[in-house]
């Protein structure tokens, strides 16, 4: 508005242009200084009823400005009321109505914070902090004060006692009384109950909140804890109050003392009745159900004591009755008195030394058990010695049986034929083609059969060395002079030495450059010369590569084995 009026004036009065320009520059400078000061207050402050509250006011002033004074005012229905004034030159001024309750915290050109004590509901309202600077003028900011009422919290028990097995009832009630605003109330527990809340409006805008916990009582929850939890802005932290549940129930009874081994003559025995009850049990009673209480059985509080040795007629059913304010419960127990244990003595034993242990046996008249002492062995129970000896003997017999079986198996393996009964097929290992012993050939060829006589050489009457069957693999390269195996040659030599007085005739047809052939032998007088072996045709290699002779080249169809048995060349053995 000032700038508009100045421009209008300059249009109408151009002569005063220079003076008005100076005025315009001054107004612009003042307008820029408006943004050079600032008052900072919180928008809202919560005060607790009956306690102190702080109203903060910070002043930010530019260096080109100077603080004249700072003050607090309150708006009432009939207008504004000044609460406090601070002037750097004249000091602090507070009206008499607030002189005892209001004060500046630390007055200065930058701080106008005040403190209000003993806040009441009348202090609710809007408060304004004003700052006067030169040449700018006044700057202000307002805050709203609310009064909170801290609740009064307590827990009360239900109207009726908690009886085990009763109906659902109120266990306890958590109350947050006269709170502003209303408090948040709840129960914390591990029981399976439910909460029920009620709220009541009071004067001055406060509220009372009640939360009931409803649950069906059970003796198993005796001693458990409920926790009342209250949350409110006036509280620095959650308010928690524990409540212990008290459930009343009739006695739970437990009878002690009977171990099932009561026998005639046993002494110092008793039956004790223990009861768990709320309230505590006040009455105990022992009775016998199947007859009169025997003589010598006395009732002492909750215990039935037998003051004499047990007798057979003490057997029976006994009952313990326990009562309290809630009810009466009982527990029955059947007692069986057995025959006395036998007193037979153990038979005498002889001392036995086992390893390093010293064992002493009991005497016939001594009731002490065998004592075993050893630095390395723990004492053995009766009968353990026999078990150990029996186990050792059994183990030795088992090892002996294994050795016998191993020997039998080894002997059978040695007598087992490892060759092939099919003599027309060659098998490699040389130990399967061992030459027969002389005494074995003697049994085969000593019967005088013309087909089994040895043939002599027509030329010089000597027996040429020949290769074994193991060497038949190179039969084509080096042929035996007489075409016979070493076994036949050795057999011929044996017959020559053992039968010098017998006559054997050997005839052979020998043609140079033709294959040898043989014919049946004839008996002739035995000369001083050695018998002449007969030449046999050279063995032909079979089409399957076997170096054995054809079947018609052998004198006999049986061949001897190392164990003395005879094996046919033509038969199959299964």
From Swiss-Prot:
Q: Where is the signal peptide?
A: 1-35
Q: Where is this region: Disordered?
A: 442-484, 498-549
State the family named in the UniProt similarity comment for this chain.
Answer: Belongs to the nectin family.
Q: Which domain of life is it from?
A: Eukaryota
Q: Which residues are tagged as glycosylated in the record?
A: 52, 64, 167, 204, 301, 313
Q: Which CDD domains match?
A: Ig (cd00096), IgC1_2_Nectin-3-4_like (cd07704), IgV_1_Nectin-3_like (cd05887)
What InterPro entries does the database record attribute to this sequence?
CD80_C2-set (IPR013162), Ig-like_dom (IPR007110), Ig-like_dom_sf (IPR036179), Ig-like_fold (IPR013783), Ig_sub (IPR003599), Ig_sub2 (IPR003598), Ig_V-set (IPR013106), IgC1_2_Nectin-3-4-like (IPR033320)
The protein in question is named: Nectin-3-like protein
Please name the source species.
Answer: Danio rerio (Zebrafish)
Membrane topology per the entry is: Single-pass membrane protein
User: Is Membrane found in the keyword set?
Assistant: yes
What residues does the Ig-like C2-type domain cover? 151-240, 251-336
Tell me which parts of the chain lie in the Extracellular compartment. 36-387
Q: What does this protein do?
A: Cell adhesion molecule that promotes cell-cell adhesion through heterophilic trans-interactions with nectins-like or other nectins.
> Which Pfam families does this UniProt record tie to the protein?
C2-set_2, Ig_3, V-set
Where is it located?
Cell membrane; Cell junction, Adherens junction
Ig-like V-type domain location is 36-146
Cytoplasmic face: residue ranges? Answer: 409-574
Give yes or no: UniProt keyword Chaperone.
no
Query: What are the UniProt keywords, alphabetically?
Result: Cell adhesion, Cell junction, Cell membrane, Disulfide bond, Glycoprotein, Immunoglobulin domain, Membrane, Repeat, Signal, Transmembrane, Transmembrane helix
Q: Where are the transmembrane segments?
A: 388-408
Task: Report biased composition (Basic and acidic residues) as residue ranges.
Answer: 465-481
Name the Gene Ontology biological process terms: heterophilic cell-cell adhesion via plasma membrane cell adhesion molecules; homophilic cell adhesion via plasma membrane adhesion molecules; symbiont entry into host cell
- Can you supply one Gene Ontology CC term for this chain's record? apical junction complex
Q: Which residues form each disulfide bond in the chain?
A: 57-129, 174-228, 273-320
């Amino acid at each position: 508005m000032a700038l508009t009026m100045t421009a209008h004036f300059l249009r109408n009065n151009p002569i005063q242009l220079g003076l008005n320009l100076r005025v315009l520059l001054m107004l612009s400078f003042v307008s820029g200084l408006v943004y050079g000061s600032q008052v900072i207050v919180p928008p809202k402050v919560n005060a607790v009823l009956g306690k102190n509250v702080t109203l903060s006011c910070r002043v930010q002033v530019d260096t080109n400005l100077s603080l004249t004074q700072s003050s607090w005012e309150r708006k009432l229905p009939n207008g504004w009321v000044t609460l406090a004034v601070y002037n750097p030159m004249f000091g602090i001024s507070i009206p008499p109505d607030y002189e005892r309750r209001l004060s500046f915290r630390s007055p200065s050109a930058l701080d106008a914070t005040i403190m209000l004590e003993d806040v009441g509901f009348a202090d609710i309202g809007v408060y304004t902090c004003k700052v006067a600077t030169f040449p700018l003028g006044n700057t202000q900011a307002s805050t709203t004060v609310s009064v909170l009422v801290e609740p009064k919290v307590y827990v009360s028990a239900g109207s009726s006692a908690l009886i085990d097995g009763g109906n659902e009832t109120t266990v306890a009630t958590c109350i947050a009384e006269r709170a502003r605003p209303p408090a948040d109330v709840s129960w914390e527990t591990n029981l399976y109950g439910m909460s029920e809340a009620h709220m009541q409006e009071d004067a001055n805008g406060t509220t009372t909140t009640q939360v009931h916990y409803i649950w069906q009582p059970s003796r198993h929850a005796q001693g458990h804890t409920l926790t009342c939890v209250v949350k409110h802005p006036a509280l620095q932290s959650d308010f928690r109050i524990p409540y212990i549940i008290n459930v009343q129930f009739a006695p739970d009874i437990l009878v002690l003392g009977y171990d099932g081994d009561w026998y005639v003559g046993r002494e110092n025995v008793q039956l004790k009745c223990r009861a768990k009850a709320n309230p505590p049990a006040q009455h105990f009673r022992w009775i016998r159900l199947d007859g009169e209480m025997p003589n010598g059985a006395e009732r002492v509080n909750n215990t039935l004591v037998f003051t004499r040795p047990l007798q057979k007629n003490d057997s029976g059913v006994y009952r313990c009755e326990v009562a309290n304010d809630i009810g009466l419960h009982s527990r029955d127990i059947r007692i069986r008195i057995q025959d006395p244990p036998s007193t037979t003595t153990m038979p005498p034993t002889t001392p036995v030394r086992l390893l390093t242990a010293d064992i002493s046996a009991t005497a016939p008249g001594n009731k002490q058990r065998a004592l075993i002492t050893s630095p390395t062995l723990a004492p053995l129970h009766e009968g353990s010695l026999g078990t150990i000896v029996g186990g050792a003997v059994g183990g030795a017999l088992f090892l002996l049986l294994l050795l016998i079986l191993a020997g039998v198996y080894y002997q059978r393996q040695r007598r087992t034929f490892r060759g092939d009964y099919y003599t027309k097929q060659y098998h490699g290992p040389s130990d399967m083609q061992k030459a027969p012993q002389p005494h074995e050939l003697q049994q085969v060829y000593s019967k005088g059969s013309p087909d089994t006589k040895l043939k002599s050489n027509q030329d010089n009457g000597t027996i040429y060395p020949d290769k074994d069957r193991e060497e038949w693999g190179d039969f084509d390269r080096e042929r035996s002079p007489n075409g016979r195996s070493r076994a036949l040659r050795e057999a011929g030599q044996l017959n020559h030495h053992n039968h010098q007085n017998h006559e054997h005739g050997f005839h052979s047809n020998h043609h140079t450059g033709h294959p040898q052939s043989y014919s049946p032998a004839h008996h002739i007088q035995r000369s001083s010369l050695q018998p002449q072996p007969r030449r046999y045709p050279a063995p032909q290699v079979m089409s399957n590569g076997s170096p054995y002779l054809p079947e018609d080249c052998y004198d006999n169809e049986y061949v001897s084995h190392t164990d003395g048995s005879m094996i046919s060349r033509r038969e199959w053995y299964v």
